[in-house]
């Protein structure tokens, strides 16, 4: 099931405040969804995710099909029982991962033939197979199988003709995904994915075709795939707000804090990205006042937490009181710099907790601003604070 209630709109942008009801719970939008590729958000316990305000997380259809496999997943009743997460889950279709295999795969109208990256077995992914896998996973939101249109094809920018061919196949796969989803009697919700590369006319065609299929929700795919930032922003400005207003809109794989706030202004309700978790493991920390590189030697003796305004466990400890509010229970930059230098696993665990908390809290601030009718002021303050630097 899926029910989307549009609660409030912003008069000066396309931003919306909504509520999404799914089989495993209610999600307040706009929302950021942490990525749990292999059935876990790397380095974070489910309890910690709930404490920091995560309402819905992602799982990766392709990787969970490879390992542990459908037999094991089915024995646990799906992904929720396997990873002990009782809130909603969205699974991608596996299309992006198959596309990423490059020379190891062959895409045809029927589907994708590829060699398993785990053991080399010859495998086949089709819209029908993707729906069958995601039905076993029992995710609340299922994504159609699509072909991710690359920004470059054979060393040149993907032409309009190449993008059209890819988009039209994704459109046909959307229909096959929908037919199989219904045949299986899946009780969850299937989203269609708008493709078309960097060509607005193709995006418009894809969008209209998917709207005619009447999916419960829609995603904008094929962005953040190597294109220049200005071209990504142009697609964000063009496509999301043209999707049906009474259904949720999901921007796949985006992005920085600035991208999220801009995406909300462009009419997006749902975001996911590996950036907060991956960057945390590589020493880049997102803070209210800009990005911090914890490996920089200047943090070696710094007593401040990662973000003096933050109330996450890394920055505020068990008290939950930020440094700016007088709290001194959080871990210092000096300590986290030390953990990183020594390769201690606690380091990336704490920085991941912080980065995810930052993203989730940013979305809470956006929701609060939309409810209060001051989203424009919130955006201006956000930009000014992020530009200040740490």
Swiss-Prot record:
GO terms for cellular component: cytosol. Zn(2+) binds at residues 310, 312, 315, 354. HAMAP family: Q_tRNA_Tgt. Substrate binds at residues 92-96, 146, 195, 222. Its EC number is 2.4.2.29. Keywords: Glycosyltransferase, Metal-binding, Queuosine biosynthesis, Transferase, tRNA processing, Zinc. Binds 1 zinc ion per subunit. This is Queuine tRNA-ribosyltransferase. GO terms for molecular function: metal ion binding; tRNA-guanosine(34) queuine transglycosylase activity.
């Amino acid at each position: 099931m899926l029910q989307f209630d549009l609660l409030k709109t912003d008069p000066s942008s396309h931003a919306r405040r909504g509520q999404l009801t799914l089989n495993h719970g209610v999600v307040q939008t706009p929302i950021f969804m942490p990525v749990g590729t292999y059935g876990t958000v790397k380095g974070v316990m489910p309890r910690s995710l709930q404490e920091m305000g995560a309402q819905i997380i992602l799982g990766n259809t392709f990787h969970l099909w490879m390992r542990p496999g459908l037999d094991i997943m089915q024995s646990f009743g799906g992904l929720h029982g396997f990873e002990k997460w009782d809130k909603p889950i969205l699974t991608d279709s596996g299309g992006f991962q198959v596309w990423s295999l490059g020379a190891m795969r062959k895409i045809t109208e029927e589907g994708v033939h590829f060699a398993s990256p785990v053991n080399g077995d010859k495998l086949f992914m089709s819209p029908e197979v993707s729906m069958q896998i995601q039905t076993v996973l029992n995710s609340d939101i299922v994504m159609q199988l699509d072909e991710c249109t690359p920004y470059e094809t054979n060393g040149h920018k993907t032409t309009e003709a190449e993008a059209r061919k890819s988009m039209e196949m994704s459109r046909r796969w959307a229909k096959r995904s929908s037919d199989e989803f219904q045949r299986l009697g899946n009780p969850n919700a299937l989203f269609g994915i708008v493709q078309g590369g960097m060509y607005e006319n193709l995006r418009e065609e894809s969008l209209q075709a998917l709207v005619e299929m009447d999916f419960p929700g829609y995603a904008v795919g094929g962005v953040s795939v190597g294109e220049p930032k200005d071209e990504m922003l142009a697609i964000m400005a063009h496509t999301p707000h043209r999707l049906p207003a009474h259904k949720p809109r999901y921007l796949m794989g985006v992005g920085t804090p600035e991208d999220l706030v801009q995406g909300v202004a462009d009419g997006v309700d749902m975001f996911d990205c590996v950036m907060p978790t991956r960057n945390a493991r590589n020493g880049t920390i997102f803070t209210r006042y800009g990005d911090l590189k914890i490996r920089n030697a200047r943090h070696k003796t710094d007593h401040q937490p990662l973000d003096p305004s933050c109330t996450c466990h890394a920055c505020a400890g068990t008290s939950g009181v930020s440094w700016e509010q007088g709290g001194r229970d959080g871990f210092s930059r000096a300590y986290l710099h030390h953990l990183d230098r020594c390769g201690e696993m606690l380091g990336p665990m704490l920085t991941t907790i912080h980065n995810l908390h930052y993203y989730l809290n940013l979305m809470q601030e956006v929701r609060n601003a939309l409810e209060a009718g001051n989203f424009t002021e919130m955006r201006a303050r956000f930009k000014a604070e992020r530009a200040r630097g740490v």
